[in-house]
Amino acid sequence: MKHELSALKPLFILLPLLVLGFVLFWTLFGGTLSKDFQFKSAPSEQFTQEEIQGAADVALRRFKYGFSGCTMTKLQYVDAYASSDTWNWAAEYNADEGVVFHSTFTTDDFFAPKNGFNPNDTYAYQWYVARSNGGHWKIVNLGQG
């Protein structure tokens, strides 16, 4: 039994180091916001500014941890695309409320191509964020448009 535990000792040392390395990598090399980043939000008939900010935070978090080599310059809430009685797109994702953000980001020449983006380019991206019963926001769709 003692011999089996000593054989696992390198694993107990290596595993935390790998986890730490992974966390540091995504912290240092994840998506970033530009120095002149702008978040634009017009008044909404459906959502408070706090609700819009909460949904925006979900999109920004996804950008931070999923878009290494990219720098976001703008994120804008578009009230006209919010899920509504006349166009309830959120229902397609089993949700009852949804908001849409338009963003612009640039890519670098090292990390971005590894994520499928052209190097040194600018992208317009949409983020569809939805929730049910006033619960937590989640991204249900995203992409160029």
Predicted regions, residues:
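Flexible low-complexity loop/turn motifs enriched in small/helix-breaking residues
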Residues: 3-16, 20-113, 117-121
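Short beta-strand edge/turn micro-motifs at domain boundaries
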Residues: 122-145
